[in-house]
Amino acid sequence: MKRLISCLTIICALNASAAAETTSNPCSRWISFLKPVCQRIHQTWAEGHDDMYFSGYAWHNRYVYSNEKIKSYNETAWGGGLGKSLFDEKGNWHGLYAIAFLDSHRHLEPAVGYAYLKTASVNKDLKAGLGYSVLVTSRVDYDNVPIPGALPWAALFYKRITIAATYIPGSSREGHENGNVLYMLGKISL
């Protein structure tokens, strides 16, 4: 519950910060080479559609984990969250999100981040995208310390519905297995 409140506090702080900035030059205090990053994040927040995220599956790589270990893991990573997203002038997707889900040990794991996908249109309603996400998360097994990360991300967009996946790399060292998880999530643009 504390982590959920922390995520909501971060979202509210970002919203208050965005509202406090002047609309004419919201990134004026950023270092010059980071201004494009600020401007894209601000554009996504200000012009993006509201999104509702849901998750439900985390596949643990069968080539890394034993059957016994897999049976002990939670692969139904139920959770959800909120976000903002938009397709830019080139048709590529940008998203800001805050989600929480049940991790492999059935503990609540929050994450907030930004994602970018280079997209290709299959037809008018269907797009495919490949890109990355940069995020901050925290886990019980790491004493709930905020952990920054970057992950690959792929998605299929159909009208307002999106199915996305990321692969969390890890170690397969005997007795120290972690990561190596395909995490699936969905999104509905409201």
From Swiss-Prot:
Residues 1-18 form the signal peptide. The keyword Signal applies. Keywords: Acyltransferase, Cell outer membrane, Membrane, Signal, Transferase. Transfers a fatty acid residue from the sn-1 position of a phospholipid to the N-linked hydroxyfatty acid chain on the proximal unit of lipid A or its precursors. GO terms for cellular component: cell outer membrane. Belongs to the lipid A palmitoyltransferase family. InterPro entries: LipidA_acyl_PagP, OMP/PagP_b-brl. The keyword DNA-binding does not apply. HAMAP family: PagP_transferase. GO terms for biological process: lipid A biosynthetic process. Its main location: membrane. Pfam families: PagP. This is Lipid A acyltransferase PagP. The record marks K69 as: Role in lipopolysaccharide recognition. It is an enzyme of class 2 (transferase). It catalyses: a lipid A + a 1,2-diacyl-sn-glycero-3-phosphocholine = a hepta-acyl lipid A + a 2-acyl-sn-glycero-3-phosphocholine; a lipid IVA + a 1,2-diacyl-sn-glycero-3-phosphocholine = a lipid IVB + a 2-acyl-sn-glycero-3-phosphocholine; a lipid IIA + a 1,2-diacyl-sn-glycero-3-phosphocholine = a lipid IIB + a 2-acyl-sn-glycero-3-phosphocholine. GO terms for molecular function: acyltransferase activity. Its EC number is 2.3.1.251.
